[in-house]
Amino acid sequence: MVISKVASKCSPKNVTQSMVLVPSRNIASRKGFVKPIDPKEIIHPFYRPSQIEEFTLCSTERNPSLMDGKPVFPISLPLLSTSVLPQLLYKKIIFPSVRNIVPWLKKFNYIRIKNYSDEYYTIDFKPLEMPTVESKLTITNFPELKILVDLLENTNGGRTDIHNFELCLNNILQKRMSTRLFVEDIYIYLIQNYVTTIPKLILVTKSIKNHLNNGIDHLSILEKLVNEILYLVHSKKFTMDLVLMNTFNGLLKEADNKFNTHSSKFGFSETTKESLLMLYIQAEDIHSSKELLGNLISKKSYPKDEIILAYLDLINKAVYKSNPENAILQRLSYTSNFFNIINHTTNPEILRFFIHNSRHFKEIQCVLDMILKKKNRKDIVLPLCIDLIEKTVSVSDSAVSTSLNLTRLSDYFETMLGMNVRIEAKEVFMKK
């Protein structure tokens, strides 16, 4: 880390407080500064200052800054934010002097390094190969089950249906207490053999919710039933409409209360959570998707590329619908914990998303530095040549900076590709 190398140049003996100040009028005046930016408020998913940037920052006497002091850092204000509605804004990072840079950089790097890991596990997941349980029940052995089957066949998911279903189910369980017939066995049998429509699934899901406090007493049992529901949804290609999604979320919410936990789904296995993540993405529930994906990332369990790309597509849809003016800011917020994924991925499409959402060449350089460390860097960067050139031009604010940044980009291309820069990329490069 460059901190230890440059500390002696820009750190006084008694540094007790770190400050990054945002100028409002005169950058040289104390009145021109407002509340310091805490590094933990910065939610940039992939920007890290390089050693050269850190050295330059600590060597600049007058108004040292990151990313040229431009307001391109995505900030989340924790005191004004909720998990569903974060308060986001762009800010610039400019210091009044070199005095407090080192402690600030230490904190900034610590926050980001503590979540970094070279170890990661890609979930080997196929939705139609979920670990379901084979039911051993039959109507021949349990003829009273036919009543439940008949109710299912005629249901529309209404209150009367669920009431009658519950009466019959409880009656069967009471009569069969001596045979150790468990309620989860009945649910699994019905889901596997008779739940063929969304109204039927809604009815059974509501019934499972009602029995969380009477029969389903372990999270592992609930996970078995959730697996059956998820397998059914994926195999039948059910559309997750609002009623079905609310019913399913109601089940999980009741499970949180039952098992006295913030989120019972976090206790599921990685394969179950990934299947559930697919469900949330298909239902375009971006907040639940972000929450569950964040849990997987924190466990160093990364979904397959196709699921990550589906999540990124969902972000683009949601951001466009909600606030096109601050699209990049919101996209970075929804991917604020993606550093390890970006650092480890070899998929150009994932990296393209972050290139397109860069607002400064330093951000582009961060992506390029990650690619540079990969063995197959040539295969990764080739499909991105045009995107990198065009984005470099768009984030450069003058002819001089455009020329300088394109020269730097050319150096990256030469290192990674040698003379094998794609013809189309050469043509675009020459035109710029």
From Swiss-Prot:
Residues 1-34 form a transit peptide. Keywords: Mitochondrion, Transit peptide, Translation regulation. One of its GO terms (molecular function) is translation regulator activity. One of its GO terms (cellular component) is mitochondrion. Its main location: mitochondrion. Required for translation of the mitochondrial OLI1 transcript encoding subunit 9 of mitochondrial ATP synthase. This is ATPase expression protein 1, mitochondrial. It comes from Vanderwaltozyma polyspora (strain ATCC 22028 / DSM 70294 / BCRC 21397 / CBS 2163 / NBRC 10782 / NRRL Y-8283 / UCD 57-17) (Kluyveromyces polysporus). The lineage of its organism: Eukaryota, Fungi, Dikarya, Ascomycota, Saccharomycotina.
